[in-house]
Amino acid sequence: MTKITIVKCPQCGTDVEWGEQSPHRPFCSKKCQMIDFGEWADEENAIPGAPDMSDSDGWSEEQY
């Protein structure tokens, strides 16, 4: 017996069957996938954490 995994679409809350028959998983549709992508692109969503200073060398050109 195969267990079917059902997840909620993170955008609209619709039940989505997790598998190859759901190509946009975890989203229910391409529309919900693109809405979510747009929110990330517009920086409405973010992963919490300290600011990334990896490309900063600790000085500003304005100091000199």
Swiss-Prot record:
Iron as UniProt keyword: no
Binding residues for Zn(2+): 9, 12, 28, 32
Superkingdom of origin: Bacteria
Listed Gene3D superfamilies: Erythroid Transcription Factor GATA-1, subunit A (3.30.50.10)
Biased composition (Acidic residues): 54-64
Entry keyword set: Metal-binding, Zinc
Short name of one Pfam family: YacG
Gene Ontology molecular functions: DNA topoisomerase type II (double strand cut, ATP-hydrolyzing) inhibitor activity; zinc ion binding
SUPFAM superfamilies: Glucocorticoid receptor-like (DNA-binding domain)
Cofactor: Zn(2+)
Cofactor note: Binds 1 zinc ion.
rRNA processing is among the record's keywords: no
Matching InterPro entries: DNA_gyrase_inhibitor_YacG, Znf_NHR/GATA
Region ranges (Disordered): 42-64
A Gene Ontology biological process term: regulation of DNA-templated transcription
Stated family: Belongs to the DNA gyrase inhibitor YacG family.
Subunit-level organization: Interacts with GyrB.
Known function: Inhibits all the catalytic activities of DNA gyrase by preventing its interaction with DNA. Acts by binding directly to the C-terminal domain of GyrB, which probably disrupts DNA binding by the gyrase.
Identification of the protein by name: DNA gyrase inhibitor YacG
Gene field: yacG
